């Protein structure tokens, strides 16, 4: 009988891959994760999007950065490349769907989806450290004013994001997993989330799901 090194092989270490790998490992499966991109830390992430070798993913041109761009006929797909996948380059926004999503006529009759999915959204929010941006930025101000003028001021709210908003620039021991996770540094509001957080405030997947895989479950790197 053939023997295998892994029970499950997960392709990609983005949101889908990292969550799948951790949960299957917790259930006792032997899991391998394949990632095309490399591992980054705060010192190796690009300082700007003009640092093409560190920012763009185009191995044929010697670029092994975090941003992959896949052009198709009518659209271009932006995705992440590196350990942590899209979490390295997304804007941290983590919204829960509005009511119409849960009650859509195509599936709303099957079950109470809002109640069904609530525990999983709560779990994901805990893992990703979701909280609202604590300070109003100029765009917040303009959006709020626009909502007022349109008579829908109740629809404005601060953005839910996966960021540690401690004292700006101050390093603290893991505030999310009882000290079992990596240190965090308070967000400085530099606006570089989509280039790669060099501060250490952004809750990318290598700081939660993948971190637990590597540290708690003894994954070989």
Q: Language-model features: where?
A:
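Conserved redox-cofactor binding core of oxidoreductases
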Residues: 112-220
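N-terminal glycine-rich phosphate/pyrophosphate-binding loop and immediately adjacent elements
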Residues: 1-105, 109-115
């Amino acid at each position: 009988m053939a023997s295998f090194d892994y029970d499950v092989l997960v392709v990609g270490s983005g949101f889908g891959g990292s969550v799948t790998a951790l949960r299957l490992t917790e259930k006792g499966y032997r899991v391998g994760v394949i990632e095309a991109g490399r591992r980054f830390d705060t010192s190796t992430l690009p300082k700007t999007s003009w640092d093409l070798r560190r920012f763009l993913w185009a191995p044929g041109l010697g670029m092994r950065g975090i941003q992959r761009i896949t052009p198709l006929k009518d659209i271009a797909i932006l995705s992440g490349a590196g350990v942590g996948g899209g979490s390295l380059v997304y804007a941290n926004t983590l919204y829960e769907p509005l009511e119409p999503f849960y009650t859509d006529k195509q599936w709303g009759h099957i079950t109470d989806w809002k109640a069904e999915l609530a525990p999983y959204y709560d779990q994901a929010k805990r893992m990703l450290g979701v909280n609202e941006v604590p300070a109003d930025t100029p765009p917040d101000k303009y959006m709020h004013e626009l909502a007022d003028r349109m008579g829908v001021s109740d629809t404005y709210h601060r953005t839910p994001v996966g960021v540690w908003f401690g004292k700006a620039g101050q390093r603290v021991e893991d505030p999310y997993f009882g000290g079992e996770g990596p240190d965090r540094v308070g967000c400085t509001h530099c606006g570089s989330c989509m280039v790669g957080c060099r501060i250490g405030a952004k809750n990318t997947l290598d700081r939660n799901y993948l971190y637990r895989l590597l540290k708690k479950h003894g994954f070989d790197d």
